[in-house]
Amino acid sequence: MPAIEIGRICVKVAGREAGRKCVIVDIIDENFVLITGPKSLTGVKRRRANVKHIEPLDKVIDISRGASDEEVLRAIANAGLTEFMKEIVKPKLVPV
């Protein structure tokens, strides 16, 4: 089970969207992934994110690489995770 894979649900731990859940849509390279909330559901807009700024969760949805926000919304609804995605997680502060 790879931690960083397409369809993996994650929590943003850094930035203005910290604590919000998102879905990995594409893997750009070993340091960056393309994520989306989608914005209409979680408030996280589609963007590139550093893998150090996301925390993978144990849930995975079935989407294709580069899926649109509408396809991601459908996959979340089919998996019954709509309410789970709306919940905001308090990020864990780790001393540097």
From Swiss-Prot:
One of its GO terms (molecular function) is structural constituent of ribosome. InterPro entries: KOW, Rib_uL2_dom2, Ribosomal_eL14, Ribosomal_eL14_arc, Translation_prot_SH3-like_sf. The keyword Zinc does not apply. It comes from Staphylothermus marinus (strain ATCC 43588 / DSM 3639 / JCM 9404 / F1). One of its GO terms (biological process) is translation. The keyword Ribosomal protein applies. Coiled coil: none annotated. One of its GO terms (cellular component) is cytosolic large ribosomal subunit. It holds the Pfam family KOW. Keywords: Ribonucleoprotein, Ribosomal protein. PANTHER family: 60S RIBOSOMAL PROTEIN L14, LARGE RIBOSOMAL SUBUNIT PROTEIN EL14. This is Large ribosomal subunit protein eL14. Belongs to the eukaryotic ribosomal protein eL14 family.
